[in-house]
Amino acid sequence: MTAAAELRPRRVRPVRIWLTLVAMLIAVMVLVGGATRLTESGLSIVEWKPVTGTLPPLNDAQWRDAFEGYKTIPQYRELNAGMTLGEFKTIFWWEWGHRLLGRVIGIAYLLPLLWFLWRGAIAPEWKRALWAIFALGALQGAVGWWMVASGLSQRTEVSQVRLAIHLTLALVIYAAIVWTLRRLAGRPPIVAAARLKFTAIALLALTLVQLFLGALVAGLRAGRMFNTWPLIDGALIPEASRLWFEQPWWKNLFDNHLTVQFDHRMMAYALWALAAWHAIDALRARAGGAAGGALWLFAALSLQAVLGILTLLYQVPIGLALAHQAVGIVVLTLAVLQVERLTASKSKEAPRVMPAPASQRG
């Protein structure tokens, strides 16, 4: 065994712990963002100050200034006129906490990355990927403000499309970190039929589409309408005149409450059916760890479907809505792991974390 091979487990472990903690922080960030949306707190801070905005108001004068800023936007004038300073503080803390967590994640990612690079602990083939993840994180901060800005001038809420982009980008970053963690583990590949790989990839792609659709539902508050199941608007499939009345037709996919909720339901049915097929196929093929992964993915999707139905029937209580969002993250995690285990190549060496140069070893 070479010295590099002997050192690999010891050198990989700190990197994997770091990425695991970052992934956990992102998952928490997504849930805090969900709570911020559900409590209608996302527009309480009307400025974007990436550095100086780290500190909250520290005295009465600063609190009054922040409140006066909120009073200038349509949401206050049309929905919250008469709100007290105490009520404003409640929504302010949600948004401030969400933004602070974003800053914490940036620091928790960048500083250890620089440390590992300085120590020579990351192999060249991973440097570009890790920097790309950081770049996506920086972009996510800008997208977050782009989303908030959509609700500051003419709307009483943020754009549902920008909200969906913001959430989906966060989950893409999360998925990239989960993928990297799995590859760094260096587990042996699973021999499986091409159809299993195809359905696993399809499940991951459709999961991301479904999460985007769910964000559209949330942004439009469409979950507070058509609160029946399995019927929607009195039918299994609503009338075309109700689904496609806006012009041009494609606007219905983003702006029509009925169409957006119907699309989210139909995608859920498709995902559940595909996951069931994938699990049965993996079991019949005796695909080893992939069979277990397929069963876990199907179980998580089944739980997610139940939570989605309950969230709809009870008209989006915060607890159920956040549970639905949390299980969505679990589904995405399992989908990423399933694709990774089925697409790992035998011909390639397992991803390496390089030992530090002798001069830098402690």
From Swiss-Prot:
Superkingdom as given in the UniProt entry: Bacteria
Reactions accelerated catalytically: Fe(II)-heme o + 2 A + H2O = Fe(II)-heme a + 2 AH2
Enzyme class label: oxidoreductase
Cofactor(s) this protein requires: heme b
Pfam families per UniProt: COX15-CtaA
Transmembrane residue ranges: 15-35, 104-124, 129-149, 161-181, 200-220, 266-285, 293-313, 316-336
GO CC aspect terms: plasma membrane
Pathway: Porphyrin-containing compound metabolism; heme A biosynthesis; heme A from heme O: step 1/1
Binding site for heme: 264, 324
Keyword Transmembrane in record: yes
Single GO MF descriptor: oxidoreductase activity, acting on NAD(P)H, heme protein as acceptor
Membrane topology: Multi-pass membrane protein
EC number: 1.17.99.9
Keyword annotations of the record: Cell membrane, Heme biosynthesis, Iron, Membrane, Metal-binding, Oxidoreductase, Transmembrane, Transmembrane helix
First-listed, main subcellular location of the protein, grouped into a coarse class: membrane
InterPro entries: COX15/CtaA_fam, HemeA_Synthase_type2
GO BP of this protein: heme A biosynthetic process
Annotated localization: Cell membrane
Function, as annotated: Catalyzes the conversion of heme O to heme A by two successive hydroxylations of the methyl group at C8. The first hydroxylation forms heme I, the second hydroxylation results in an unstable dihydroxymethyl group, which spontaneously dehydrates, resulting in the formyl group of heme A.
Similarity-based family: Belongs to the COX15/CtaA family. Type 2 subfamily.
Subunit structure: Interacts with CtaB.
This protein's name: Heme A synthase
